[in-house]
C-alpha cells in the first residue's frame, strides 16, 4: 500500500494539466500579445452595437449569451438578423439551430431582410411581377450564395443528438486548432426547450431539465471555446417583469450564462414617450458578467419591421431623454458612459 501511495503521489506531482497555475506568472507575455494584436472589442459583433457594448464587447469565446422573449415577439427574427450579419459582413461561420422553422423559412426571411422586399412577396413568388424587386432579389441571392451561414432544424431531436450535430459542424465546416478548440464561429440556438419524452427522466420537472440542457450547452461552449447566442421562452411573468426569474428554468440558466437579456414588445406608454420612430420593441440587458449592462430602467430601443423580417437597433431610452449618443461617450472615456 505504501508503494501504491507513493506511485499515486508521483503521478499527481507530474500531472501538469490539472495543476493550479500562478495567476500572474505569464501576464507580461499576455500583455505583449494583447498590445501587439489590438482589438476593437473582445467578442464577435452581433450587428447590434449597444447590445454588444452592454454585454462586454460582443459574443466572447466560451460563453452562452441568453436572450429571453415571450412567444411571437420576434426572437427568431433577432436570431436571423444577428446570424446573417456575422456570416455576411464578417465572414465568420454561423450555425443556426432552429427548433421550429424549416430551411425555406430562413431563406425567404433572409432575402426579405437583405432586400427589403416583403416576406409575403418572396414566399408567394409575387416579387417576380415587379422588375425592380425581381432584380434586387436575384442580385442579393448571388451575393449571399456562399456566405458561411448554416441552418439545421433540430425540432424533436434529443439534446445529445443536437450536441453531435454541433461537434460535426465544428470539425467539418469551422475547423479545430491543435488544442481541439474551434476557430472563430458562432452557434445560434433558437430556442432552449424540452423536445420529447426521451429527454424527460424520472420525476424531474421541466425547469430542472432545462437546467441540465443549459449545463450541457455551457460545457460545450467552454470545451470548444465557442460563443453561443441562445434564446429562451419567458414565462408569463415576463409580460410585465424584467428580471432573471422570468426565464423558464431560470436559476440554472442565469447561473451559467455570461449575460441575460429580455427582448419584448414596448408598451403603448413607452412608444408614446420614446416616439413611434424609435421602435416597437425593447432589449433589456438584465445581467452581464463581462459588460457594464444598462442603468436601472434603461433599455435599448429596437424597431422590428416584420414585413421585411428586419431588426434595427436604436438609441437607449436614456440617450433619447438626455439627447446623447453612447458612441460619443465612448470616445471621451468610460466615466460618462450612461451604462452602469
What is each residue range found by the language model?
Residues 1-61, 142-145, 220, 293-295, ...:
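Core recognition of P-loop NTPase motor domains used across DNA-transaction enzymes
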Residues 4-14, 21, 26, 129, ...:
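Intrinsically disordered, low-complexity regions enriched in small/polar residues
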Residues 25, 116, 120-127, 141-144, ...:
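C-terminal regions of RecA-like/P-loop NTPase motor modules
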Residues 46-49, 65, 149, 283, ...:
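A broad, low-specificity signal marking well-ordered, structured residues that form hydrophobic/aromatic
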Residues 48, 53-231, 237-239, 245:
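Glycine-rich nucleotide-phosphate-binding loops and adjacent flexible coil segments
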Amino acid at each position: 500500500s505504501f508503494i501504491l501511495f507513493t506511485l499515486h503521489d508521483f503521478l499527481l506531482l507530474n500531472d501538469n494539466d490539472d495543476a493550479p497555475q500562478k495567476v500572474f506568472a505569464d501576464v507580461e507575455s499576455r500583455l505583449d500579445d494583447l498590445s501587439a494584436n489590438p482589438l476593437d472589442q473582445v467578442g464577435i459583433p452581433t450587428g447590434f452595437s449597444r447590445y454588444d457594448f452592454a454585454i462586454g464587447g460582443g459574443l466572447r469565446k466560451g460563453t452562452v449569451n441568453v436572450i429571453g422573449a415571450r412567444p411571437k415577439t420576434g426572437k427568431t427574427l433577432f436570431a436571423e438578423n444577428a446570424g446573417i450579419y456575422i456570416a455576411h459582413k464578417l465572414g465568420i461561420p454561423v450555425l443556426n439551430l432552429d427548433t421550429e422553422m424549416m430551411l425555406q423559412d430562413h431563406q425567404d426571411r433572409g432575402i426579405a431582410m437583405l432586400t427589403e422586399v416583403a416576406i409575403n412577396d418572396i414566399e408567394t413568388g409575387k416579387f417576380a411581377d415587379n422588375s425592380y424587386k425581381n432584380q434586387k432579389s436575384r442580385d442579393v441571392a448571388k451575393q449571399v450564395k456562399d456566405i458561411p451561414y448554416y441552418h439545421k432544424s433540430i425540432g424533436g431531436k434529443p439534446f445529445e443528438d443536437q450536441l453531435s450535430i454541433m461537434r460535426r459542424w465544428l470539425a467539418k465546416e469551422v475547423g479545430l486548432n491543435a488544442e481541439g478548440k474551434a476557430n472563430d464561429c458562432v452557434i445560434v440556438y433558437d430556442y432552449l426547450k424540452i423536445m420529447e419524452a426521451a429527454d424527460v427522466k424520472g420525476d424531474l420537472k421541466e425547469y430542472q431539465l432545462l437546467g441540465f440542457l443549459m449545463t450541457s450547452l455551457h460545457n460545450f461552449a467552454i470545451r470548444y471555446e465557442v460563443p453561443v447566442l441562445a434564446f429562451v421562452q419567458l414565462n408569463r411573468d415576463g409580460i410585465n417583469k424584467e428580471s432573471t426569474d422570468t426565464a423558464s428554468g431560470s436559476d440554472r440558466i442565469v447561473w451559467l450564462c455570461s449575460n441575460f437579456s429580455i427582448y419584448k414588445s414596448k408598451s403603448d406608454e413607452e412608444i408614446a414617450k420614446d416616439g413611434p420612430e424609435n421602435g416597437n420593441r425593447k432589449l433589456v440587458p438584465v445581467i452581464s458578467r463581462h459588460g457594464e449592462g444598462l442603468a436601472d430602467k434603461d433599455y435599448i430601443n429596437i424597431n422590428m419591421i416584420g414585413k421585411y423580417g428586419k431588426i434595427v437597433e436604436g438609441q437607449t431610452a436614456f440617450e433619447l431623454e438626455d439627447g446623447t449618443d453612447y458612441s460619443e461617450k465612448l470616445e471621451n472615456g468610460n466615466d460618462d458612459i450612461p451604462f452602469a
